[in-house]
Amino acid sequence: FDSDGDRDAILTTTAGIVVFANDGEGVFREHVRFPDLPYGFGMGACDYDQDGDLDVFVCQYYSKRNLEGETLRGSFPVPFPIQNATNGGPNVLLRNDGGLQFVDASQEAGLANDNSRYSFACLWEDFDNDGDQDLIVANDFGPNNFYSNNGKGGFVDYSDAPGIKDGGFGMGLTAADFDLDGLYDLHISNMYSGAGNRIARQKWFHADKDEKTRKTLL
């Protein structure tokens, strides 16, 4: 990340995103921490703005808010939705300005809209073969997001593209040219059930059930 020839490390933790610099002798030291990003479930690094250093997209699954917008303390800081949820944690694009100095460029790059969808994973790849890295985000509880890199440090939302807005419960992503036509194809793994009856964790969804039922099923 600091372009000094060795591999650095970036981790998602409950204390935020933490970047460790490699001193070149096998020792890593904490360089910078982002405490406002405590719910990262996935990350992807690439030089999206082609300035010579790696930038990072962070998928934040949880939000600090519940449905009423209040701050919660303890585990499970938000309810578990069923479908098409938009109250997850906001995803963040961290632009590397050199020397391990990262700046939140989400708004500037056009990635700040419709980006709170309980995102599990992201993938950078040049899907349109124009020489820059595009971005796809796998979202739990709803449609995925796809952004085309405009080559000028910004992105255009193409989430309505066929096969992207599939409404599944996105868990993972991988790309390869499986049909050898020179274009990257995409596989999105999902955890999905079409069952009409579901067991939900929210206590208000099963308030009318007796104690034995709650202990057995929940």
Segments predicted by a language model, with ranges:
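Acidic, glycine/proline-rich Ca2+-coordinating loop motifs
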Residues: 1-218
